[in-house]
């Protein structure tokens, strides 16, 4: 591969602004993402760290097409995907997935797990109807859950189990790139390590690329290839994990490391 094709995702001068009103006739915006440039290499775990309100989740949602960018360019596997989700080809949607922070709000409480996992398979025409149950069973086993979970509902499960289902749903389409938006922050400490270890095993087994969003710097020390720090909508520092923890240079990064 050339250096250009090594990058599975490239973000160039991305801006996502939200209009919040007018003051003296002038439009006022929240600059949630304000000129971010970032490249993620195939097969790596890129850590994106920042406090609440730094813009990291907005960046993720813009990359996924859930928010339209105000300005800038997003390229995935060499294809410009800056337009919103509705204008993206199905094969791009299939290849890019996201796991949200709160599985309780991201899973339909009125559906059982079989229905939840079948939906992406149906949307993308991945398997025939008669093979659906077998495929759902395989997906459940991928995240270390038995087929007995198939007819449970999200409300009957614990937070860790629900997040495993969220991960299973994201992996159902066999993506190459997954955004993990604080996937363990809403879980008990006892289950966090299990989820992280499972994600790393899946990443290695399936050669996945992760954009791992978190506020937990210590977690990134152990799992990330590189780390980027987001502050007030901008990336203020980015380096290899070793370099980042050994020789941080930005005052905000130093503050995070000392807190």
Spans of features found by a protein language model:
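Conserved ABC ATPase "signature" region
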Residues: 131-148, 201, 257
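Conserved ABC transporter NBD signature motif
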Residues: 72-80, 92
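Conserved ABC ATPase signature
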Residues: 153-157, 161
């Amino acid at each position: 591969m050339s250096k250009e094709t090594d990058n599975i995702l490239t973000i160039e001068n991305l801006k996502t602004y939200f209009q919040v009103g007018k003051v003296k006739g002038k439009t006022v915006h929240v600059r949630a993402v304000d000129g971010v440039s970032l490249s993620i290499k195939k097969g790596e775990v890129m850590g994106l760290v920042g406090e609440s309100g730094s813009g990291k989740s907005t960046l993720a949602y813009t990359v996924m097409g859930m928010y339209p960018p105000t300005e800038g360019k997003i390229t995935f596997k060499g294809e410009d995907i800056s337009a919103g989700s509705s204008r993206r080809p199905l094969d791009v949607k299939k290849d890019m997935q996201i796991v949200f922070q709160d599985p309780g709000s991201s899973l339909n409480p009125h559906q059982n797990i079989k229905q939840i996992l079948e939906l992406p398979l149906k949307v993308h025409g991945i398997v025939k109807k008669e093979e659906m149950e077998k495929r759902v069973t395989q997906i459940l086993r991928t995240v270390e859950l038995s087929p007995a979970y198939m007819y449970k509902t999200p409300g009957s499960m614990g937070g860790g189990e629900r997040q495993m289902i969220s991960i299973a749903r994201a992996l159902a389409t066999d993506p190459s790139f997954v955004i993990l938006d604080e996937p363990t922050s809403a879980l008990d400490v006892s289950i966090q390590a299990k989820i992280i270890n499972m994600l790393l095993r899946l990443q290695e087994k399936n050669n996945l690329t992760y954009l791992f969003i978190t506020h937990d710097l210590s977690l990134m020390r152990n799992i990330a290839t590189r780390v980027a720090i987001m502050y007030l909508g901008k990336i203020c520092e980015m380096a290899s994990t070793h370099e980042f923890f050994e020789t941080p240079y930005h005052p905000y990064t130093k503050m995070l490391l000392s807190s």
